[in-house]
């Protein structure tokens, strides 16, 4: 997969190219990341990249010419088929389904805004899609871009150490992930659930699915509204609710 970055601070992306899962993907040739800074496309000695907005108001906008030239340079390097994405709080909110969609693209160009944003005409003429990582304000598009790169790269074959990891992540099937445990078996009198030590893979799968359903019901119930539960899932969720109610009753009785 090839990803082009348009950013005033391309050095920030060393966090992606040099470390962790994405760093290994770059090292192994599974992910290629190139960057272009609008500053390199300025024509004045101050390398100016911001300009005042028409109509007044606080803040500045990214200057049109350097930004467009940087995007054009990235498009030329990418060749045919590159999708241009602007990281914007006004875009579609990124979720696992969206990540899965974006991962089908072999070439992405990510435009990172700064200041108060970019000229609307640049969005209309150069941008294919706008994406957001949440309803809050950041100083620029670099962190959202890194979030997108990290999440999308997990779908590239060979990137993860275990091929099932991406499909078993939280949200991969519309549910939160189940609890996980490692050594020691007992930590401050808290024991690993016996089923995980049983070696019975069918029961382990059933337990994990029940916990995943239950955790989603407790923490993100709105996610269940969009799911058509199978007969097994409905039964497991019902069991979880009963067990949870019993635990709450026991806890209340001890309080």
UniProtKB/Swiss-Prot annotation:
Gene Ontology terms: cellular component: cytosol
Enzyme class: transferase
Gene Ontology terms: biological process: tRNA N1-guanine methylation
SUPFAM superfamilies: alpha/beta knot (SSF75217)
InterPro entries: Alpha/beta_knot_MTases, tRNA_m1G_MeTrfase_C_sf, tRNA_m1G_MeTrfase_TrmD, tRNA_m1G_MTases_N, tRNA_MeTrfase_TRMD/TRM10
Catalytic activity: guanosine(37) in tRNA + S-adenosyl-L-methionine = N(1)-methylguanosine(37) in tRNA + S-adenosyl-L-homocysteine + H(+)
EC code: 2.1.1.228
Claim: Transferase is one of the keywords in the record: yes
Binding site for S-adenosyl-L-methionine: 113, 133-138
Superkingdom field: Bacteria
Pfam families linked: tRNA_m1G_MT
Protein family according to the UniProt entry: Belongs to the RNA methyltransferase TrmD family.
Subunit structure: Homodimer.
Function: Specifically methylates guanosine-37 in various tRNAs.
NCBIfam families: PRK00026.1 (NF000648), trmD (TIGR00088)
Protein name: tRNA (guanine-N(1)-)-methyltransferase
Organism: Klebsiella pneumoniae subsp. pneumoniae (strain ATCC 700721 / MGH 78578)
